[in-house]
């Protein structure tokens, strides 16, 4: 069996590693570097360049040089973050037939983000094969912890397109924790925070490393993040600043010039890196553009203080997810033993300072932020291949559920539940003789389904006619170790079932998941009111249904006046339920009124039941007397002596 390689498929850079015995090896690519730019260029002669060669020619071929495609993977074209990127990217982002955000490269050719990302994966595969001297067919690929189901599926697809069987998708912070934990000699339980600020995404995870009978157990206690915040956004702030300064000085807007934009991107990234180790840098771009007066040159000094002012709010945005992660993990900041920084952007002094300020301790400097994730993926690959037995990884998921009556989000699996996991619950129909149900699957923290992200839906048909509430439909949520969701629904009476693996085309947008959690906290009162209104409506619907049924069976036992009052109250409740603007108080008042008016009907039903029971008891007494009369003879005739053995069913 060949080795399972570990791939960190990053927004800005990618990296590949393998395990050799118990030693990890981060493999150098054909250009001699241990990280490869996640840049893909499509040339006129159909050649595809990946990494440094693609980056080198980007200035002269901006429309066919694709970068930061990971920000689009598993996303819908309409999402505001995709729309924002359309104005910033020199290449074209197009709406595909299925509504996804695709890219245009190599002339008019449309490509899906997994297809483009597959080129970077293929480069990592080739890098490993060149080093090992044998084919590589299996890999563990990492994703941001806050990637949703469709984004994970799209990443898995990228691996498959590249010719790899993706054995596991694991979260980047978890992979970094694996790399850190196995490299340290400290014994005993430790709680660590992994702060992962990469090129396009931000994650924070609180992870407990425990020594259980010689086995290292990595348990993710909580995770949080922002899937549209990263180094690319820091670069963009510098680009916007340069464009503004140049326009003030020269009166020329560089934002409309794709060639100039590509040069600015390169210069901004270089300046940002230099300002991590020096207080000032100079951006010098001769012949950046030209107008009627001749060529224009760009020369601009930027200080570290200026950069920090430009990105201050971006750095600040990373702190709220840290607070939520600490709270969700049920720990205090003081309980954290180590803070690990992952992602190239964490080299920025301002980021380190902010992390130290929040966690109250210096982050560890002995973890390579560019390589730790790939190293962790390689370790997980060794575990999956059976070559390593002393590591157990317990990762977590986000909240998942289905929409139930009244638009309520009924959670099947709560956030930060350890995966793999499975949960089943029985639901029923909302209407009489309902022949089919639609199962809508959502991801998010809001109480009402509409406030969450729809991942997918499917129908269960062929339910036999029955009154509402009678059919039993078992819905099962099953999340595998990759964090990919499988949902099934089964009618327990007929055995009919339907199931899907959620492959929603959309991906969660910039702070959509993050926003869901914030909204859930900020709008808790509003959500509670909406939930209570839905409950009142459901209660009203149920009362209307049961009252109508009782009227049909026992209405003739009521006086004309009683029946008329009951029907009027029933109609009044039905009208208020039809009124979409009716509030909870109005519905509750009508429910209470109908409850009082229908008491007489209840009394008639109860009296009727008692009469039936009395009649049944009288008939039973008569039968018993007859039995005594012929007792002995009947016993002799009907009873057979026999041995018996009790068989217990499992």
From Swiss-Prot:
Acts as a chaperone. One of its GO terms (molecular function) is ATP binding. The modification Phosphothreonine is found at residue 201. Belongs to the heat shock protein 70 family. Pfam families: HSP70 (PF00012). The keyword Nucleotide-binding applies. The keyword Chaperone applies. This is Chaperone protein DnaK. Keywords: ATP-binding, Chaperone, Nucleotide-binding, Phosphoprotein, Stress response. The lineage of its organism: Bacteria, Pseudomonadati, Pseudomonadota, Betaproteobacteria, Burkholderiales. Gene3D superfamilies: 1.20.1270.10, 3.30.420.40, Actin, Chain A, domain 4, Substrate Binding Domain Of DNAk, Chain A, domain 1. Induction: By stress conditions e.g. heat shock. SUPFAM superfamilies: Actin-like ATPase domain (SSF53067), Heat shock protein 70kD (HSP70), C-terminal subdomain (SSF100934), Heat shock protein 70kD (HSP70), peptide-binding domain (SSF100920).
């Amino acid at each position: 069996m060949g080795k399972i390689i570990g791939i960190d498929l990053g927004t800005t850079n990618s990296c590949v590693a393998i395990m050799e015995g118990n030693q990890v090896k981060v493999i150098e690519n054909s250009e001699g570097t241990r990280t490869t730019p996640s840049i893909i260029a499509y040339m006129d002669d159909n050649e595809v360049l990946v990494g440094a060669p693609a980056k080198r020619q980007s200035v002269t071929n901006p429309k066919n040089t694709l970068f930061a495609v990971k920000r689009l993977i598993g996303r819908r074209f309409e999402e505001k973050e995709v729309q924002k990127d359309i104005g910033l990217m020199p290449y074209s982002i197009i709406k595909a037939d299925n509504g996804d955000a695709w890219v245009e490269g190599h002339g008019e050719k449309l490509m899906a983000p997994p297809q483009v990302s597959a080129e970077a994966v293929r480069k990592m595969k080739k890098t490993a094969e060149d080093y090992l001297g044998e084919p590589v067919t299996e890999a563990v690929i990492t994703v941001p912890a806050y990637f949703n189901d469709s984004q994970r599926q799209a990443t898995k697809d990228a691996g498959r397109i590249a010719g790899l069987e993706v054995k596991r998708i694991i979260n980047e912070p978890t992979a970094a924790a694996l790399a850190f934990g196995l490299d340290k000699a400290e014994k005993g339980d430790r709680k660590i925070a992994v702060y992962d600020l990469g090129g396009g995404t931000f994650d924070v995870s609180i992870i407990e490393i425990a020594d259980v009978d010689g086995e290292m157990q990595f348990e993710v206690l909580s995770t949080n993040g922002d899937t549209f915040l990263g180094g690319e956004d820091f670069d963009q702030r510098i680009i916007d600043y340069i464009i503004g300064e140049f326009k003030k000085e020269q009166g020329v807007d560089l934002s409309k010039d794709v060639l100039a934009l590509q040069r600015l991107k390169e210069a901004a990234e270089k300046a940002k890196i230099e300002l991590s180790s020096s207080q000032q840098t100079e951006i010098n771009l001769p012949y950046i553009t030209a107008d009627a007066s001749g060529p224009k040159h760009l020369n601009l000094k930027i200080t570290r203080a200026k950069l920090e002012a430009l990105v201050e709010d971006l750095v600040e945005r990373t702190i709220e997810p840290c607070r939520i992660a600490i709270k969700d993990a049920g720990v205090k900041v003081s309980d954290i033993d180590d803070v690990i920084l992952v992602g190239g952007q964490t080299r920025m002094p301002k980021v380190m300072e902010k992390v130290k300020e929040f966690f109250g301790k210096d982050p560890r400097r002995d973890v390579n932020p560019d390589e730790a994730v790939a190293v962790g993926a390689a370790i997980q690959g060794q575990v999956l291949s059976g070559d390593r037995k002393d590591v157990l990884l317990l990762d977590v998921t986000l909240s998942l559920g289905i929409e139930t009556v009244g638009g309520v989000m009924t959670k099947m699996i709560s956030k930060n539940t350890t995966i793999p996991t499975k949960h089943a619950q029985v639901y029923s129909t909302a209407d009489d003789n309902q022949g089919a149900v639609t199962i809508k699957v959502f991801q998010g923290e809001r109480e009402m389904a509409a406030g969450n992200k729809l991942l997918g839906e499917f129908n269960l048909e062929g339910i036999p006619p029955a009154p509402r509430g009678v059919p039993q439909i078992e819905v099962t949520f099953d999340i595998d170790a990759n964090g990919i969701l499988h949902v099934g629904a089964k009618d327990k009476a007929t055995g009919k079932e339907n199931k899907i693996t959620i492959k929603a085309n959309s991906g969660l947008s910039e702070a959509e998941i993050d926003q869901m959690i914030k909204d859930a906290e900020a709008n808790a009162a509003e959500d509670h009111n909406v939930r209570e209104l839905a409950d009142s409506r459901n209660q009203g619907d149920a009362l209307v249904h049961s009252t109508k049924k009782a009227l049909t069976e026992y209405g003739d036992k009521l006086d004309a006046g009683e029946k008329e009052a009951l029907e009027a109250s029933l109609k009044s409740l039905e009208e208020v339920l039809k009124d979409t603007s009716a509030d909870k108080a109005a519905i509750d008042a009508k429910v209470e009124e109908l409850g009082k008016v229908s008491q007489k009907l209840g009394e008639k039903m109860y009296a009727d039941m008692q009469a039936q029971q009395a009649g049944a008891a009288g008939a039973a007494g008569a039968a018993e007397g007859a039995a005594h009369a012929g007792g002995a003879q009947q016993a002799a005739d009907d009873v057979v002596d026999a041995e018996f053995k009790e068989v217990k069913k499992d």
